[in-house]
Amino acid sequence: MIERTIKNILISQPEPTDLLKNQYKALSSKYEVEFTFYKFFDVVGISNREFRDAKISLLDHSAVIFTSKLSVDNYFRLAKELRLTIPETMKYFCITETVANYMQNYVQYRKRKIFYGKLTFKDLVEVIAKHKEEKYIIPCAEDSSIDYFTLLDNAKIKYTKAV
């Protein structure tokens, strides 16, 4: 049997900021391999001009559904560019607790204001179903999973898809 040695490993994510203090440095020295970091895709938020052309108002909605940290960043970046003040009464629904904790960068974390599912979008829809009176906006990519919207439709949730 032929034994091959691996000398290079391609990591499909951005390079860590501090290479000396992360797990890749330890692996590199232990197994004598070199790590190459390459970001295969880059998600870019839309401009405020494109958002205005879509004729969606952030303030017409009483709740937001976040499926990633990137959607949180883009939502609040867009609100800032449009010079909108997000009301204190706005409710936030996050797919995981990690995304909910990330919200602390933008809003004060309150249990009555930020809700999250266990792990999947189906778990989150169960939480959302308890707040059917809200009007939701869901910031998402153009190629977002259709399953999200099917689950929301089946639960009879009023939402606007903001691409």
Predicted regions and their residues:
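Conserved beta-alpha
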Residues: M1-V163
